[in-house]
């Protein structure tokens, strides 16, 4: 069985789902079932404030492992407070750390993220930090002891796909020195998830692309299959691209095979 771990938690599914933006809890539960997701993120701030669409959310997610997140935190201090509240509400030790002061592009603050991660680890949290695709920051977080690193593929909710591929490839090269790498944010299509998994990264987190689809359960299934296909492709050892064409069938001894000099090479 090809499993992976977040701290001591062993998981089979490499697709984590978010719980926001669904039209109702029934559709959300159907999508979770279709994705065969074991872990679903939940915004503690919205649950605690009883925001529209979040009343009764924890009850609706019964039977699924919850990953509280600190969405809405703009500073390390706010993130730490939300993480503590999340532990009280869910009983879970782990937390998806989000520190986002920028309301326009929703890009994470690297300095506040690092500061919050250090404090939360001191308080015995398993920290899963959302971050930009910055390998140096990832190694700093890993040195602190975070359970994962979660670089973005594109801005949250954009659906742009893997705009940061070149930087994510660096994460793939350096995986031996990193905790599990979960690509979070910006994936809009199942093919985007497959692309990430083909790099050899550990998992993806998807919310908007599924919740805003015309048929969320069907899209959730499509993402599940794409994640599985991408992972299998990576494990199968893909061929390396070549600079020139290479025939799939031998040409030696085939009737009418040219025997003269090849174009551009001159007399032999």
Curated annotation (Swiss-Prot):
Cellular component (GO) terms are:
cytoplasm
Which residue ranges run through the membrane? none
Instruction: Quote the biased-composition stretches of kind Pro residues, using this chain's numbering.
Output: 258-268
Catalytic activity, EC: 2.8.1.10
* GO BP, sorted A to Z: thiamine diphosphate biosynthetic process
Positions annotated as active site in the UniProt record: 96
**Carries keyword Transferase?**
yes
UniProt keyword Cytoplasm present:
yes
Q: In which pathway does it act?
A: Cofactor biosynthesis; thiamine diphosphate biosynthesis
Question: What compartments host this protein?
Answer: Cytoplasm
Q: Which UniProt key words apply to this protein?
A: Cytoplasm, Schiff base, Thiamine biosynthesis, Transferase
Entries under InterPro entries matching the protein: Aldolase_TIM, Thiazole_synthase_ThiG, ThiG
Query: Which reaction equation describes what this protein catalyses?
Result: [ThiS sulfur-carrier protein]-C-terminal-Gly-aminoethanethioate + 2-iminoacetate + 1-deoxy-D-xylulose 5-phosphate = [ThiS sulfur-carrier protein]-C-terminal Gly-Gly + 2-[(2R,5Z)-2-carboxy-4-methylthiazol-5(2H)-ylidene]ethyl phosphate + 2 H2O + H(+)
Q: Where's it mainly located?
A: cytoplasm
Give me the ranges of the annotated region Disordered.
238-268
What's a single GO MF annotation on this record?
Answer: thiazole synthase activity
Instruction: Please give the CDD domains that the UniProt record associates with this protein.
Output: ThiG
Tell me the function of this protein.
Catalyzes the rearrangement of 1-deoxy-D-xylulose 5-phosphate (DXP) to produce the thiazole phosphate moiety of thiamine. Sulfur is provided by the thiocarboxylate moiety of the carrier protein ThiS. In vitro, sulfur can be provided by H(2)S.
Q: Which family does the entry's similarity section mention?
A: Belongs to the ThiG family.
Q: How does it assemble?
A: Homotetramer. Forms heterodimers with either ThiH or ThiS.
Protein name as catalogued: Thiazole synthase
Species this protein is from: Thermus thermophilus (strain ATCC BAA-163 / DSM 7039 / HB27)
């Amino acid at each position: 069985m090809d499993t992976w771990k977040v701290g001591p938690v062993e998981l089979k599914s490499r697709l984590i789902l978010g719980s926001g933006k669904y039209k109702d809890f029934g559709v959300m539960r159907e999508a979770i079932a279709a994705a065969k997701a074991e872990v679903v993120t939940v915004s503690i701030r919205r649950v605690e404030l009883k925001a529209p669409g979040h009343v009764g959310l924890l009850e609706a997610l019964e039977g699924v492992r919850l990953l509280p997140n600190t969405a809405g935190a703009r500073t390390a201090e706010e993130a730490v407070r939300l993480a503590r509240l999340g532990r009280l509400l869910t009983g879970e030790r782990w937390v998806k750390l989000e520190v986002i002061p920028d309301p326009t592009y929703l890009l994470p603050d690297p300095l506040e993220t690092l500061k919050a991660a250090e404090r939360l680890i001191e308080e015995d949290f398993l920290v899963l930090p959302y971050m930009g695709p910055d390998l140096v920051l990832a190694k700093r977080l890993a040195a602190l002891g975070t359970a994962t690193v979660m670089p973005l593929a594109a801005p949250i909710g954009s659906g742009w796909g893997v705009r940061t591929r070149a930087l994510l490839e660096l994460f793939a090269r350096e995986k031996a020195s990193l905790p599990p790498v979960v690509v979070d944010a910006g994936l809009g299509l199942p093919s985007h998830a497959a692309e990430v998994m083909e790099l050899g990264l550990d998992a993806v987190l998807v919310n908007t692309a599924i919740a805003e689809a015309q048929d969320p359960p069907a899209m959730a299934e499509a993402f599940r299959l794409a994640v599985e296909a991408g992972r299998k492709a990576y494990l199968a050892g893909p061929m390396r691209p070549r600079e020139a064409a290479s025939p799939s069938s031998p040409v030696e001894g085939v009737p009418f095979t040219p025997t003269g000099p090849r174009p551009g090479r001159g007399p032999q």
